[in-house]
Amino acid sequence: MKRTRTSKAWMREHINDTYVQLARKEGWRSRAAFKLMEMDDKDKLLKHGEVVVDLGATPGGWSQVAVKRVGDGGLVFALDLLEMEPIHGVHFIQGDFREDEVLQQLEEQLGERRVGLVMSDMAPNMSGVPLVDQARIMHLAELGLEFSRVHLKPEGAFLVKVFQGTDYETFLKQMRETFKTVAVRKPDASRDRSPELYLLGRTLR
């Protein structure tokens, strides 16, 4: 397939991106690792011994950060429809986290432990049509919120990527109805022109 001018420009920007270069140098699977590290440094999400679920984990940048920071006493579960190269210490489950079979696998591995952090950097396949892409990413965020309501321990946290635009305020309201505190984050590693934000909900109501 012939690349469009837009896709060529994106590829040029991606290759020259400081965070992309730094990720390669330091062995992170994606530039997104720096976003999570910055937010964790600020909000202290990845506590030693914590149980973490990474929704839409592939290629694994966030899982790499999580498993390093929760330490040997913690557990990191990575879920994705796509395959992911193994990461030492990360329990990967391939499949749709809404399906009973996938949830059963997760629950069997969790045992009696409750999840302290659900994190989602999920993004849809972008169509290039802003309204369509906005609707898709907000739907993914809603799925992550539903998952969190069921699986988080009472004092747990949910970190999720959203886009500013249609349905953002509605979703923010849902977050505030679900959690006692909700913060908005825009990490330095997020591209300036990107509409992405991260919402952090803490302590279930």
Swiss-Prot record:
Q: What EC designation does it have?
A: 2.1.1.166
Alphabetical GO CC annotations of the entry are: cytoplasm
Q: Where in the cell is it found?
A: Cytoplasm
Keywords of this entry? Cytoplasm, Methyltransferase, rRNA processing, S-adenosyl-L-methionine, Transferase
Database matches in Pfam families: FtsJ (PF01728)
Instruction: List ligand-binding residues for S-adenosyl-L-methionine.
Output: 60, 62, 80, 96, 121
Primary location recorded for the protein, binned into one broad class? cytoplasm
Q: What catalytic activity is recorded?
A: uridine(2552) in 23S rRNA + S-adenosyl-L-methionine = 2'-O-methyluridine(2552) in 23S rRNA + S-adenosyl-L-homocysteine + H(+)
Where does the record place the catalytic residues?
161 (proton acceptor)
Q: Which NCBIfam families match?
A: PRK11188.1
Return the PANTHER family for the record.
RIBOSOMAL RNA METHYLTRANSFERASE, RRNA METHYLTRANSFERASE 2, MITOCHONDRIAL
What exactly does this protein do? Specifically methylates the uridine in position 2552 of 23S rRNA at the 2'-O position of the ribose in the fully assembled 50S ribosomal subunit.
Protein name, UniProt field: Ribosomal RNA large subunit methyltransferase E
Which species is this record about?
Answer: Dechloromonas aromatica (strain RCB)
